[in-house]
């Protein structure tokens, strides 16, 4: 049974700095909205590589973004060593910049926390909370650079970027 606004599943393969990143996106918007969003994600990825000088080594040889932007989705985001999963009830056409902010934040974690992290976070316990007095520092750097990357990539103006702090 089809419902109003039933989405078409879309996937695009993009390349940033000759390094493949696969985007899978589930939304109920247009192909033009998807292409704009994927292009902006590519700008974020490219700017992050500029900050760190290179891509980290991905065990799978690529990085995958999986996003679910539907009215029925809950808002959440989580990075992993080789991928990021994002969800939001916001549509690409109305929440574009906010959704990109989550992408930028989570992708910065590819370096900061996934590969550079306080010792108190190790070893990871995937069955319980990992309390750490230093996590605020890792998240603080990620919040700062996530917003700065959007501005450097031309996706947010300086006034709005400074207002976030």
Please tell me what each predicted stretch does.
Residues 8-11, 116-124, 129-165:
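Acidic/His/Gly-enriched intrinsically disordered linker/tail segments
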């Amino acid at each position: 049974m089809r419902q109003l606004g039933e989405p078409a599943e879309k996937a695009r393969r993009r390349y940033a700095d000759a390094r493949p990143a696969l985007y899978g996106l589930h939304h109920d918007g247009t192909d033009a909205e998807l292409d704009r969003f994927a292009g902006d994600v590519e700008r974020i990825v490219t700017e992050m590589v500029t900050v760190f000088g290179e891509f980290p080594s991905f065990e799978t040889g690529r990085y995958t973004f999986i996003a679910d932007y539907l009215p029925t989705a809950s808002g959440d985001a989580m990075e992993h060593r080789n991928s990021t999963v994002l969800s939001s009830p916001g549509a690409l056409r109305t929440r574009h910049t906010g959704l990109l902010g989550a992408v930028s934040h989570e992708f910065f974690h590819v370096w900061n926390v996934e590969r550079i992290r306080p010792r108190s976070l190790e070893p990871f316990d995937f069955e319980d909370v990992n309390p750490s007095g230093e996590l605020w520092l890792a998240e603080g750097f990620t919040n700062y650079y996530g917003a700065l990357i959007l501005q450097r990539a031309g996706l947010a103006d300086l006034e709005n970027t400074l207002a976030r702090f």
